[in-house]
Amino acid sequence: MRLLMLLSVLEVCWAQYNPHTRYGQTSIVHLFEWRWDDIALECERYLAPNGFGGVQVSPPTENAVINNPQRPWWERYQPISYKICSRSGNEHEFREMVKRCNSVGVNIYVDAVVNHMCGKDVSAGISSTCGSYYNPGLRDFPAVPYSGWDFNDGKCKSRSGEIESYNDIYQVIDLGHEPIKSSEYFGNGRVTEFKYGTKLGTVLRKWNGEKMAYLKNWGEGWSFMPSDRALVFVDNHNNQRGHAAGGPSILTFWDARLYKMAVGFMLAHPYGFPRVMSSFKWPRYFENGKDINDWVGPPNDNGVIKRVTTINTDSTCGNGWVCEHRWHQIRNMVIFRNVVNGQGFTNWWDNGSNQVAFGRGNRGFIVFNNDDWALSSNLQTGLPAGTYCDVISGDKNDDHCTGSEIYVGSDGRAHFSISNTAEDPFIAIHVDAKL
């Protein structure tokens, strides 16, 4: 009885690190600023069939309506109550989304804002997504209800006791030189590893003398948190706009060629639990090195979010939505990760520069060329003999491949050729893409 009780306690203590996706699903996607009804439809028509395990949704709670600037993306992070009522939809639509997504095996993960309420610079009134009254200056949020007695000024080590100036407070994004460490949050669950996208972007941009060859010990070897504690990502809604952590090294959809390589590497490598970004476009305009339009909100008609209903013939999105998760290279790497789940990191190869390759046991193999010259090498894949479809250049349709084919010999070796001018200078093969 004591042994069983101890095992039960240990199981509960470790449960917070399990993302609880369905068996065999190994990644999630952030559908940033999507409507609840569009997310429900996307779960059914695309995410579930392609092996995505879950969706991170934008904050669902009632927020202040900001009109200067006009309806920015960050108004979602100015809560005035915990009513499920935002420009993504109401509580009924949220419930239906969860029900429909769960019914096809896709989980919903909420970006919950619990650290703060709407800032005091926002005027009092009922200009909110659900019409509730609020007075930030008096810290009066009766729809919660919160009053000034519910706030903790003394615990904020800043000049004002509040967080309107980020220069006043400790940065909780741990880039390795902050007084607050990511390990302090391990008790709550997996923690976002911001160093991941920052470092990977620096390597792929070849800044500061970095090379892909140095990625052989990627993960804890780069002073990241333990793999089973980490939620990893190339970019997020914040740092793709130059905010928060990362700076100019962060790769985004604006850098499509390198971005696809970065996401491909993330999904092929066993470190951490990955989150794919799905964005919307905005009219970037730089003055003195700063994008003065970084506030722009999602595609909308008079404040109402546009439906993600324009799906192009290549399955990508229109109507102002980028939908990186629908790029076939990224979709196929989500599938790749599912196929190689549980396999080790094997058969590393590099040329000492920016041509690298590695396998995932006997289930998958990937090759990158980020050099300024062509790659042509015979490499040990660890895969069974046969002909494989490269899932970056195409898809396996029945017994045919719409892209390049790779032949693996009886010794597990295969020849790979990748031009340095290729639109997608990487190749990925796995056992489910065997012809």
Where are these regions (language model features)?
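Aromatic- and acidic-residue-enriched segments that line the glycan-binding/catalytic groove
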Residues: 65-78, 115-164
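Acidic-and-aromatic substrate-binding clefts and catalytic sites of carbohydrate-active enzymes
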Residues: 32-41, 63, 87-90
